[in-house]
Amino acid sequence: MLDLKYIRANPEKVQEGLSKRNKDVSIAPILELDERRRKLLAEVESLKALQNQKSKEVPKLKKEGKDVTDLMNELKDLSDKIKELDSKVKEVEDEIEKILLTIPNIPHESVPVGKDDTENVEVRRWGEVREPDFEIKPHWEIGVNLGILDFERASKVSGSRFTFYRGLGARLERALINFMLDLHIEKHGYTELFPPFLVARKSMIGTGQLPKFEEDAFKTTDDYFLIPTAEVPVTNYHREEILKEEDLPIKYVAYSACFRAEAGAAGKDTRGLIRQHQFNKVELVKFTKPEDSYDELEKLTADAEDVLKELGLPYRVVLLCSGDLGFSSAKTYDIEVWMPSYGRYVEISSCSNFENYQARRANIRFRRKDGKLDYVHTLNGSGLAVGRTLAAILENFQQKDGTVVVPEVLRKYMGTDVIK
């Protein structure tokens, strides 16, 4: 959530920043409501001062033996009027918060201005793209041929965009999860959390999924939500807390299943593992001091990249332009893995700095050594999306005979060096 005081003090700067997102977002309604709120508050303070003044007259008049009936009636009228105005103030404040929750974050000054993903900027590439001397098969075909992925039975059981992982497919999925967790814990210094997969509405509001994107979420009848990412429970782990400056940055890694309705994804990536209603992901989350957050974003992105380097998968890093930026993010790097059957790079991780946007919504602060309270900056990124990583392994390490070579770092988890 944006800071109302900052909006009030810098309306043109805020509107200019939001306009870079190429979305129709106006802060005019916020400013109008804020002005109304301030006028109401001034009126309340004026009436309270009058009430206080007249209240002091009561004992004085009583001492003089004078009738205070009219004065008491006047005080009652003042009290009723103050209550009425307080109620109006509350209504206006609720409306301000309601609108604030629908306004996205302001892009960081280093984010390139652009309308959509065609104007994202490539930052770097790693690894060599293989050019095999045989016809490349897509991962879903490889998986079915090897008997390790079963889309047909998953469709029978659950509908479209679900998958059964079978035999070495299930083992490969599990190996990837364990490898990613071990790497981030042992090499990168993250603390593991294993979070709930169901969260309350307040948690979804805290990270910015609600109220804007409720149609993309799976909701239960009692107002719980299946998590779209472990970002939600892990960020809310410190909701309504005051952290210690000396404990920052706090770094968590969490495996979870993720659930997405993909309401706006009709016709996109309908085959394979790229766009599923349920998928596994290892998530990285950081809580940092504001002055450190952009350095920490670079480190977090490097940590996610390290997974692909260890696996030997070619990838590139892309800086998202303002028009492609996620709702809550101030700056995002996408990591895209090479997918031979697509003939292009496909997103496998988004690493973002939300600055204090989520922290304000979730009220996560820290106390500086001088005693001052400040909001933390929150960051997160996939480290990585497991199903997409598995798909990339099948495609990049497929052999002419239909087998798939297991990356060396996974062999101790798999107990084999080839899937056949």
Curated annotation (Swiss-Prot):
Query: Which catalytic reaction applies to this protein?
Result: tRNA(Ser) + L-serine + ATP = L-seryl-tRNA(Ser) + AMP + diphosphate + H(+); tRNA(Sec) + L-serine + ATP = L-seryl-tRNA(Sec) + AMP + diphosphate + H(+)
Q: Name the SUPFAM superfamilies on file.
A: Class II aaRS and biotin synthetases, tRNA-binding arm
Q: Enumerate the subcellular locations listed in this protein's record, separating them with semicolons.
A: Cytoplasm
The Enzyme Commission number assigned here is: 6.1.1.11
A GO term for molecular function: serine-tRNA ligase activity
HAMAP family assigned to the protein according to its UniProt record, in alphabetical order: Ser_tRNA_synth_type1 (MF_00176)
Q: What function is annotated for this protein?
A: Catalyzes the attachment of serine to tRNA(Ser). Is also able to aminoacylate tRNA(Sec) with serine, to form the misacylated tRNA L-seryl-tRNA(Sec), which will be further converted into selenocysteinyl-tRNA(Sec).
Class of enzymatic activity (EC top level) = ligase
Record's protein name: Serine--tRNA ligase
Q: Where does ATP bind?
A: 260-262, 347-350
UniProt keywords (A-Z) are:
Aminoacyl-tRNA synthetase, ATP-binding, Cytoplasm, Ligase, Nucleotide-binding, Protein biosynthesis
Domain notes for this protein: Consists of two distinct domains, a catalytic core and a N-terminal extension that is involved in tRNA binding.
Similarity comment: Belongs to the class-II aminoacyl-tRNA synthetase family. Type-1 seryl-tRNA synthetase subfamily.
Give any Gene Ontology cellular component: cytoplasm
The keyword ATP-binding is assigned to this record: yes
Supply the PROSITE patterns for this chain.
AA_TRNA_LIGASE_II
Locate the residues binding L-serine.
229-231, 283, 382
